[in-house]
């Protein structure tokens, strides 16, 4: 379900997702933001457990020259979910997606900022459970002052993060890759 309000050149669209609907509103919003990004795409999510389609979209955005950056927590709340999240880093990092871990604490923010012009913020994580199994609410913003606030927030977050892109862009040992493949079998369940 989506509702919108327009004030001057500002737009705010509220969307809600639920597991009973065949429409995957949050996933579609994220995929559209990724597809239309031209310069920058900044994402924060506590859990990065994405579909092949989402992974492909992020990798293609980076390949076409978009500065794609993803912030995940460096301090986990769930160790298995943390390990699964990290299993996605290599595939993304090798294609130019920059990965950051927030180390001062647990970052639970769920936001996506596209070219500093349009943003989504709300309760939807970049994971299977949020996108397919939970009731979620998000807001899509365009032309609002809040977008500038989000951009400044990202600047602060990046300064507090450790970039781990290089560590994961070179690949990993066979045992770690096998372990990550096993963990990914359970990704839709966590």
Task: Place the predicted regions along the sequence by residue.
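Structural alpha-helical scaffold elements that stabilize or flank donor/cofactor-binding regions
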Residues: 5, 33-36
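Conserved catalytic alpha/beta core of Sir2/sirtuin-type deacylases, generalized to analogous enzyme cores
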Residues: 22-25, 32
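A generic local structural motif
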Residues: 27-30, 126
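Glycine-rich phosphate-binding "P-loop"
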Residues: 14-22
């Amino acid at each position: 379900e989506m509702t919108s309000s327009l004030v001057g050149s500002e737009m705010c669209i509220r969307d809600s997702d639920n597991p009973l609907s065949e429409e995957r509103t949050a996933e579609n919003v994220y995929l559209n933001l990724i597809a239309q990004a031209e310069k920058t795409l900044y994402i924060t999510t506590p859990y990065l457990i994405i579909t092949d389609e989402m992974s492909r979209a992020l990798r293609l955005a980076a390949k076409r020259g978009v500065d794609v950056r993803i912030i995940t927590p460096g301090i986990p709340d769930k160790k298995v979910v943390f390990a699964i999240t990290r299993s996605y880093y290599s595939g993304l990092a090798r294609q130019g997606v920059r990965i950051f871990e927030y180390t001062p604490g647990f970052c639970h923010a769920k936001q996506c900022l596209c070219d500093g012009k349009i943003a989504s913020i709300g309760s939807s994580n970049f994971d299977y459970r949020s996108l397919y199994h939970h009731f979620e609410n998000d807001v899509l913003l365009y032309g609002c002052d809040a977008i500038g606030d989000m951009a400044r927030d990202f600047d602060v977050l990046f300064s507090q993060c450790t970039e781990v892109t290089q560590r994961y862009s070179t690949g990993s040992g066979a045992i770690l890759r096998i372990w990550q493949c096993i963990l990914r079998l359970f990704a839709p369940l966590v």
